[in-house]
Regions:
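Hydrophobic residues within alpha-helical transmembrane segments
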Residues: 19, 37, 41, 49, ...
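Interfacial helix-loop-helix hairpins and adjacent transmembrane helices
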Residues: 34, 82-149, 430, 495-517
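Helix-loop junctions and hydrophobic alpha-helical segments within the transmembrane domains
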Residues: 22-49, 429-452
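Hydrophobic, glycine/alanine-rich multi-pass transmembrane helices and their short helix-loop junctions
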Residues: 45-88, 361-365, 387-398, 447-505
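Hydrophobic transmembrane alpha-helices and their membrane-interface caps
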Residues: 1-15, 373-422, 462, 492-493, ...
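Helix-loop junctions at the membrane interface of multi-pass solute transporters
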Residues: 5-7, 13-27, 35, 56-60, ...
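Cytosolic juxtamembrane amphipathic/interface segments immediately preceding
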Residues: 30-37, 120-133, 334-341, 436, ...
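Extracytoplasmic
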Residues: 137-401, 499, 503-517
Length: 517
C-alpha cells in the first residue's frame, strides 16, 4: 500500500508543480491546467506504463507472493494514473491554490512565494546553482559518471547470488534466535537427503553398495565439517547390528564382507525394529537414503556442497555401474530443494529485469522517434542499477530473492523522471531549436518536481526499514539509494548527454514547412 502510494503520488507532484509554475507566471486557473496537461499528460502516461512494465515483469518470478506483489502494484499504478488525470483537475477546480481572478493571482503570487512557497523557493534556488554544471561542463560531468560507473562495475564482479533463509531475518528476532540455538545445541536446523537407488531388488544388501555409501558419508563429514553435524543411513544400522550380534566388540563395528551375513544382520534388525528400518530403506532394499543434519548456511554454499557430493558419488559408484546399470545417487530433501529454488527464483528475477529493460528501451525509442534520444534516456537509468549492485559488491551484501527485486522495480520507476525531463526538453527544443535554452527551461519547469518525486519515492521505500525481515530492509534502503542516484543522473548526466550527443528535435517551423510541402 505504501509502495503504491509513493509511486502514485509522483505524477500528482509533476502536475501540481507544473500547475504552480504556470500560475506563478501569471496564467489563469484554466490556462495553467491546459498548459500543464499539454506538457505533462503524455509524460505521465508513459511513466505509468514504464512503472507498470517494471512491476508486471515480476510475474516472471515463479513464486506467488512476488507475482501478487507485481500484479497488484501494477494495477495500483494504473488506477493512480486514472485518478491523477481525471480526479485531480476536478479537485483543483474545487480547491485552487490561487484566487480565480488573474490580477488577484498575480498579487497573491509574490506573497505565496515569500511565505507558503518558501520551501519551493529553497529547492529552486539550489537547482539554479547546480543547473549551469550540465551545460557549462558537459564533458567533465559525463566523464565523472563514466568513471563512477567503471568503479561500480568492478564492485558488481564481487556480487554473488546467495539466499540465506535465516540471515534474511533481523538479529534479535525470536525466529532467528531459535534457529541459532538449534544450530548450536540441537544438531542443526536443516537437513538434506541423499538417495541411493540401485535399480535392483536387494541391491542394498550388497556390501559393496554399503561400503560406497559409507565412503560417501565420510566424504560429506570431512569435506563440510562446519555444515554437517551428523549423517545416518542403512550403513549405521548394519554396523550397529553387526556389533551387537558380536557381543559389542568395537572391532565388529564394520559392514560384513559376506553378503549372506549382511543379509542376516539386516533381517535381525528388521525383526527388532521394522519402523526404523523403513525410515532408511524400502521394503525391497532397492532404494536407501542417507539423512544428513546441517547447520544453517546460504544457498550458494549448499549448492556447492550438492555439486561436490554428486561428483564424488559419480566417481565412487562408477565401479558398480556394470552390476547396477540403473544405479543413481542424488541429493534431495527440503533444504536441497529450497536452496535450488531460491537460486532459480533469483535467476528468474534477473530475466525479469532483462525483460523490463528491453521493453522500456523499445518504448523510449518508439516515443522519442530517435535512436539517439532513446539511448540518452536509457543510460542514466542504468546508472542507479550499477550503483546498487556495485555497492552491494563492495559491502559483500549478497543478492537474494528480496534485493533482486530492486533492479526491475528501480528501472521501471526511475525512468519516470527521465521521461518527464525529456518530454519537456523535446517541447522546448522543438519550439526554439536551442539545446542550452531547452535545458535551462526544462530544469526550471521540471527540476523541482523531479527532486520532490525522488524524495517521496525514497521515503516511501525507506518504510521497509521498519520490517523485521532483513531482506525487505535491504530492499528498501537499496531502492532509496537507487532513486537518489537516479535523481543525480537526471539532473546532471542527462542534460550533459543531451548537449554532447546533440539531441535535438525538429522545430515547429520545420514541421510546418514539411506539412505544407
Amino acid at each position: 500500500i505504501f509502495l503504491v502510494l509513493a509511486i502514485g503520488v509522483a505524477d500528482t507532484v509533476h502536475i501540481l508543480s507544473g500547475y504552480l509554475f504556470f500560475r506563478n507566471h501569471g496564467e489563469s486557473h484554466e490556462e495553467a491546467l491546459r498548459s500543464v496537461f499539454r506538457k505533462t499528460a503524455l509524460a505521465c502516461m508513459l511513466t505509468s506504463i514504464t512503472t507498470m512494465i517494471g512491476m508486471f515483469s515480476l510475474l516472471l518470478v515463479p513464486i506467488k507472493p512476488i507475482q501478487s506483489f507485481g500484479l497488484f502494484s501494477g494495477i495500483g499504478v494504473f488506477i493512480a494514473f486514472l485518478l491523477t488525470v481525471f480526479v485531480l483537475p476536478l479537485m483543483l477546480d474545487l480547491w485552487s491554490p490561487y484566487a480565480k481572478n488573474p490580477k488577484a493571482s498575480l498579487t497573491k503570487k509574490k506573497h505565496r512565494l515569500d511565505d507558503d512557497g518558501q520551501r519551493m523557493h529553497f529547492v529552486q534556488s539550489i537547482l539554479r546553482k547546480v543547473e549551469p554544471l550540465s551545460y557549462r561542463f558537459p564533458l567533465a560531468v559525463t566523464l565523472s559518471f563514466v568513471l563512477a560507473a567503471v568503479i561500480l562495475a568492478y564492485g558488481i564482479t564481487k556480487v554473488k547470488i546467495d539466499t540465506n533463509m535465516v540471515n534474511i531475518i533481523k538479529e534479535g528476532q525470536p525466529m532467528r534466535t531459535t534457529y541459532n540455538l538449534v544450530d548450536r545445541f540441537m544438531g542443526g536446523s536443516g537437513s538434506a537427503e541423499i538417495l541411493v537407488n540401485t535399480g535392483k531388488i536387494d541391491g542394498l544388501k550388497d556390501p559393496r553398495i554399503l561400503n560406497a555409501m559409507d565412503d560417501l558419508q565420510i566424504f560429506v563429514k570431512n569435506e563440510f565439517p562446519h555444515l554437517v553435524t551428523k549423517s545416518t543411513s542403512l550403513v549405521n544400522i548394519s554396523k550397529d547390528s553387526f556389533k551387537a550380534l558380536n557381543e559389542g566388540q568395537d572391532s565388529m563395528y564394520v559392514i560384513p564382507d559376506d553378503p549372506g551375513i549382511l543379509a542376516n544382520t539386516l533381517f535381525m534388525f528388521n525383526n527388532a525394529n521394522p519402523k526404523e528400518r523403513r525410515r532408511m530403506v524400502t521394503d525391497d532394499y532397492s532404494l536407501g537414503r542417507i539423512s544428513v543434519n546441517l547447520r544453517n548456511s546460504g544457498s550458494q554454499e549448499y549448492n556447492d556442497m550438492i555439486f561436490r557430493i554428486h561428483n564424488f558419488a559419480d566417481r565412487r559408484f562408477a565401479e558398480l555401474k556394470s552390476d547396477y546399470p540403473k544405479l543413481k545417487v542424488r541429493v534431495t530433501g527440503t533444504l536441497a530443494m529450497l536452496s535450488q529454488m531460491t537460486d532459480y527464483i533469483s535467476w528468474s528475477q534477473v530475466r525479469s529485469f532483462g525483460l523490463a529493460l528491453i521493453v522500456i528501451s523499445l518504448l523510449l525509442l518508439l516515443v522519442f522517434s530517435s535512436y539517439r534520444a532513446g539511448m540518452v534516456a536509457l543510460l542514466p537509468n542504468i546508472f542507479p542499477v550499477l550503483t546498487i549492485f556495485g555497492i552491494m559488491g563492495y559491502l559483500e551484501i549478497s543478492l537474494d530473492t528480496d534485493t533482486l527485486l530492486v533492479a526491475p522495480i528501480t528501472i521501471g520507476i526511475a525512468v519516470d523522471d527521465t521521461i518527464h525531463f525529456l518530454t519537456n526538453y523535446r517541447a522546448e527544443v522543438s519550439k526554439h531549436g536551442n539545446i542550452k535554452e531547452g535545458i535551462i527551461k526544462t530544469f526550471r519547469e521540471t527540476g523541482q518536481a523531479i527532486t520532490f518525486t525522488s524524495i517521496i519515492l525514497s521515503i516511501g521505500f525507506l518504510i521497509f526499514l521498519m520490517s523485521s525481515h532483513q531482506g525487505l530492509s535491504n530492499f528498501g534502503i537499496m531502492s532509496a539509494i537507487a532513486f537518489f542516484t537516479a535523481l543525480l543522473a537526471d539532473l546532471f548526466l542527462l542534460p550533459s548527454m543531451c548537449l554532447l550527443f546533440n539531441v535535438r528535435f525538429k522545430s515547429e517551423t520545420a514541421n510546418l514547412k514539411e506539412a505544407v510541402k
